[in-house]
Amino acid sequence: MYEAIFDLEAITPLFMRGADARSPEFSSASVKGVMRWWFRALAGGYFGNNIEALKEVEEKIFGSTRNKSRVFVRAEVEDVKKGNIYRQASSWADKTIIVWSEYVDYFFFSVLDKRRNRKTKKIDIKTRFEYFDVGSKFSISLSSTDERYFRLAEASLWMTINLGGFGFRARRGAGSLKVQMLREMLL
């Protein structure tokens, strides 16, 4: 059996949820979904217009309604950090908090809830739900008995981590992870 364990750390806030929209969730199904997307993006160039061949290989790696996956994906949260986007921004940006605040507004406007305090006339900023903050640690494990499909899944995860992101607002820079350690084993 082939196995790889990716120890990861969030370098930008990660907005990923499950059935409970208020609490963060880092699930295997979500990770597998993003891996599948990157597999399609990369393998499309190899398979060209042969969509049936692409679909067949994709089903073997990630599974389908007819066949189970040949690669087992397990995602775990190791260390959760929760925070406030604006507090985090001020510690990063020191004297440029105004510029940073506008940046945060632009990238994370859909997850911020702004309300004006009637007494102080200041805007109170609260996030609408919890999220995984910078520094949260995760682990993703891939395992398979078939080396070919294992390597394809491993490449897909590698591309997801390095070129993509997890959760929503990933296209705006959220959900970026870095690999702390990669352990590969042949069992």
UniProtKB/Swiss-Prot annotation:
CDD domains: Cmr1_III-B. It holds the Pfam family RAMPs. Its main location: cytoplasm. Keywords: Antiviral defense, Cytoplasm. It is found in: Cytoplasm. GO terms for cellular component: cytoplasm. InterPro entries: CRISPR-assoc_prot_TM1795 (IPR007522), RAMP_III_fam (IPR005537). Coiled coil: none annotated. GO terms for biological process: defense response to virus. Belongs to the CRISPR system Cmr1 family. CRISPR (clustered regularly interspaced short palindromic repeat), is an adaptive immune system that provides protection against mobile genetic elements (viruses, transposable elements and conjugative plasmids). CRISPR clusters contain sequences complementary to antecedent mobile elements and target invading nucleic acids. CRISPR clusters are transcribed and processed into CRISPR RNA (crRNA), formerly called psiRNA (prokaryotic silencing) in this organism. Part of the type III-B Cmr ribonucleoprotein (RNP) complex. This is an elongated RNP with Cmr2 and Cmr3 as the base, with Cmr4 and Cmr5 forming a helical core along the mature crRNA (39 or 45 nt in length), while the complex is capped by Cmr6 and Cmr1. The 5' end of the crRNA is bound to Cmr2 and Cmr3, while Cmr6 and a Cmr1 subunit (Cmr1-1 or Cmr1-2) cap the 3' end of the crRNA. This is CRISPR system Cmr subunit Cmr1-2. It comes from Pyrococcus furiosus (strain ATCC 43587 / DSM 3638 / JCM 8422 / Vc1).
